[in-house]
Amino acid sequence: MKKLVLIRHGESTWNKENRFTGWTDVDLSDEGRQQATEAAEVLKREGYVFDVAYTSVLKRAIRTLWTVLDGMDLMWIPVHRSWRLNERHYGALQGLNKAETAAKFGEDQVKIWRRSYDIPPPVLTADDPRFPGHDPRYQSLTKEELPLTECLKDTVARFLPLWHDTIAPAIRSGQRVIIAAHGNSLRALVKYLDGVSEADIVELNIPTGMPLVYELDDDLKPLNRYYLGDPEKVKAAMEAVAAQGKKK
């Protein structure tokens, strides 16, 4: 049996402000830093060790990973950063408050934009400063790879090459892997691993800063998955994520 650990970054400053973040490179809040520290403590206490780590090119995920590895005395292991693990791009919604957007467009519409599989938020224009083509970290990407908006289906499509070409072979070779990423890039992986339907993925919420463990067979098919930590705390955190797109 092989184990894979996933962790969504700790609470970010825009999570705290209930804003659509996407590819905007905001940092962790004080609470988010504490969540990452607590994740390191529980992983270390449960005896986890990692050989290699994967994360996005966004600082909230990178800093979460750094904090976890530091707390586990594993800062020396290889870390691979990839834009393919970025949060989904929220298009013209990036920077907007979720509750205010729900009040303007309706909770049902915002839930579709946040959680549906194949309906993207409104698109950006290429001259918008939020377009990633203006960011030097993405200068090696092709025009087709630079999103103006993304639905979860798009996020799955950009993530899977990294999984098939890099992460899955590492797990098969016996390496112990941790992935520190984002709510929707991790939803993309969960959908793929568990075969979650397009309808059911709408209700899947991943809380910040809580390690999610997959037990996999030799073909990388899931045998079990569970969060490390207090089940009631995990449940409350998932419900809080689900409530972010509701009017106040």
UniProtKB/Swiss-Prot annotation:
The keyword rRNA-binding does not apply. SUPFAM superfamilies: Phosphoglycerate mutase-like. Transmembrane segments: none annotated. GO terms for molecular function: phosphoglycerate mutase activity. It holds the Pfam family His_Phos_1. CDD domains: HP_PGM_like. InterPro entries: His_Pase_superF_clade-1, His_PPase_superfam, PG/BPGM_mutase_AS, Phosphogly_mut1. Its EC number is 5.4.2.11. The active site is at residues 9, 87. It catalyses: (2R)-2-phosphoglycerate = (2R)-3-phosphoglycerate. The record marks 182 as: Transition state stabilizer. It is an enzyme of class 5 (isomerase). Substrate binds at residues 8-15, 21-22, 60, 87-90, 98, 114-115, 183-184. Keywords: Gluconeogenesis, Glycolysis, Isomerase. One of its GO terms (biological process) is glycolytic process. Disulfide bonds: none annotated. Pathway: Carbohydrate degradation; glycolysis; pyruvate from D-glyceraldehyde 3-phosphate: step 3/5. Belongs to the phosphoglycerate mutase family. BPG-dependent PGAM subfamily. PANTHER family: PHOSPHOGLYCERATE MUTASE. HAMAP family: PGAM_GpmA (MF_01039). Catalyzes the interconversion of 2-phosphoglycerate and 3-phosphoglycerate. This is 2,3-bisphosphoglycerate-dependent phosphoglycerate mutase.
